[in-house]
Amino acid sequence: MVGEEKMSLRNRLSKSRENPEEDEDQRKPAKESLEAPSNGRIDIKQLIAKKIKLTAEAEELKPFFMKEVGSHFDDFVTNLIEKSASLDNGGCALTTFSILEGEKNNHRAKDLRAPPEQGKIFIARRSLLDELLEVDHIRTIYHMFIALLILFILSTLVVDYIDEGRLVLEFSLLSYAFGKFPTVVWTWWIMFLSTFSVPYFLFQRWATGYSKSSHPLINSLFHGFLFMVFQIGILGFGPTYVVLAYTLPPASRFIIIFEQIRFVMKAHSFVRENVPRVLNSAKEKSSTVPIPTVNQYLYFLFAPTLIYRDSYPRNPTVRWGYVAMQFAQVFGCFFYVYYIFERLCAPLFRNIKQEPFSARVLVLCVFNSILPGVLILFLTFFAFLHCWLNAFAEMLRFGDRMFYKDWWNSTSYSNYYRTWNVVVHDWLYYYAYKDFLWFFSKRFKSAAMLAVFAVSAVVHEYALAVCLSFFYPVLFVLFMFFGMAFNFIVNDSRKKPIWNVMMWTSLFLGNGVLLCFYSQEWYARQHCPLKNPTFLDYVRPRSWTCRYVF
């Protein structure tokens, strides 16, 4: 279609060049028609008609022109990034993961993914929203969200003033959600110090003694066993025990559990990326052992990536104003979510608890939860994947800011999963999907994809179960069954805009289902507590049988 439109535009231009005499003949009547008649007055109606005709012709040519210019611009940017990816960009030492020179077919710039044996390519680039927000039309959407926040604040203040007769500036929900914060701080420090010391110490001992050991296999199995004990026993059960034993509130639990998962993934990446280098060094009988420095490992623990490299592309300076703006937007999103719960969620579930559980109540709850659920989705994406990661990237001068792609343009769920969270997707792609294919066989791609879905679904459900203090596998069912089915059915071959509409519709509905089901279960467990709950009471849905007592 684009090729035909280009040819149509070129044909029109070529015809105008080939027949200048005809064009001149066509212009003459137009000139004559605009000339003043014998009475000295200009025919206004004729002038307006001519102007409308010229405008219509310009509008007709506009889409062809814009598509041709856009196509040339895309080709130019693609070639430019492909060339820059092959260079040592700003101190980005690609070492063994550098791009092979002399290849005839370079990798597409939109993916910027090297072959599996070389790993992810890091290059200096900005986040997509930073570029889009420079466009006035996109920035207006940002301003709309700010205006909506102002209206939420005004609505809350006015309602509280009418009900209480005074301005109520208490943020009881926020103070409750982030309660017992000192426990969060010392737990985080223990997790950080253990992740900083134990994996590095174990790897250093194994790497220095591997080539000298008379039983390298036993030595490797021993250190690998100790590393697994640390990952599962200390970093796995330790934080979980703290959040349960100290009965931390939900937001405080989320901080600890998310940091726990992040440290586990970081430690795995550090070992996974460096073990092959030591094995290759021993195989080549090199005199030096490639052990990263402590500073390199420490930088990686704070860098906004889950893929270890000895060095990354770095920006020359830190823009502290930009850092302050990103953190300010994060705190703004926290208050935004607070007002969404106060003005949209709390009234909804206060009314729901007055009726027994039924299909009608459930359907109304799901559809009434779509708007707050979608707003929370947008705010979570913007606060964490854009603002939080960009703030740390700027402080560390980390150059590669592609934490997400244009997931909102996805016409398939497979593309949505790849572009929504690039940071986590890269880890799953290289250490779960590719390692599964390497360990078993490249023929089992569907099984590898299923394994990745299972790992992701289990980790998500684990985080929700621990943070909310109950097991209610709604997310697991949506992710493992519907999400996986959509991934195969609505695949990358779907390119028409209608599939983007379908993707958004299902995404909206899914967020409404999640917010409705988990909120109902939360309220049910608050209003229908059990005196001596058993293990089954933690996994059996309380909202199905709870009858609220007032």
UniProtKB/Swiss-Prot annotation:
Cholesterol binds at residue 137. Keywords: Acetylation, Acyltransferase, Cholesterol metabolism, Disulfide bond, Endoplasmic reticulum, Lipid metabolism, Membrane, Phosphoprotein, Steroid metabolism, Sterol metabolism, Transferase, Transmembrane, Transmembrane helix. Belongs to the membrane-bound acyltransferase family. Sterol o-acyltransferase subfamily. The modification N-acetylmethionine is found at residue 1. Expressed in most tissues, but most strongly in the adrenal gland. Expressed more strongly in liver Kupffer cells than in hepatocytes. May form homo- or heterodimers. Interacts with UBIAD1. It catalyses: a sterol + a long-chain fatty acyl-CoA = a long-chain 3-hydroxysterol ester + CoA; cholesterol + an acyl-CoA = a cholesterol ester + CoA; cholesterol + (9Z)-octadecenoyl-CoA = cholesteryl (9Z-octadecenoate) + CoA; cholesterol + hexadecanoyl-CoA = cholesteryl hexadecanoate + CoA. Catalyzes the formation of fatty acid-cholesterol esters, which are less soluble in membranes than cholesterol. Plays a role in lipoprotein assembly and dietary cholesterol absorption. Preferentially utilizes oleoyl-CoA ((9Z)-octadecenoyl-CoA) as a substrate: shows a higher activity towards an acyl-CoA substrate with a double bond at the delta-9 position (9Z) than towards saturated acyl-CoA or an unsaturated acyl-CoA with a double bond at the delta-7 (7Z) or delta-11 (11Z) positions. Disulfide bonds join 528-546. It is a multi-pass membrane protein. Pfam families: MBOAT. Residues 1-36 are annotated as: Disordered. GO terms for biological process: cholesterol efflux; cholesterol homeostasis; cholesterol metabolic process. This is Sterol O-acyltransferase 1. An acyl-CoA binds at residues 415, 418, 421, 425, 433, 445, 456. Residues 161-180, 245-252, 353-369, 469-474, 529-550 are lumenal. It comes from the Eukaryota. The modification Phosphoserine is found at residue 8. One of its GO terms (cellular component) is endoplasmic reticulum membrane. It comes from Chlorocebus aethiops. Residues 15-34 have a biased composition (Basic and acidic residues). A motif (FYXDWWN motif) lies at residues 403-409. The active site is at residue 460. GO terms for molecular function: cholesterol binding; cholesterol O-acyltransferase activity; fatty-acyl-CoA binding; sterol O-acyltransferase activity. It is an enzyme of class 2 (transferase). Its EC number is 2.3.1.26. Residues 1-138, 207-218, 277-319, 396-443, 491-496 are cytoplasmic.
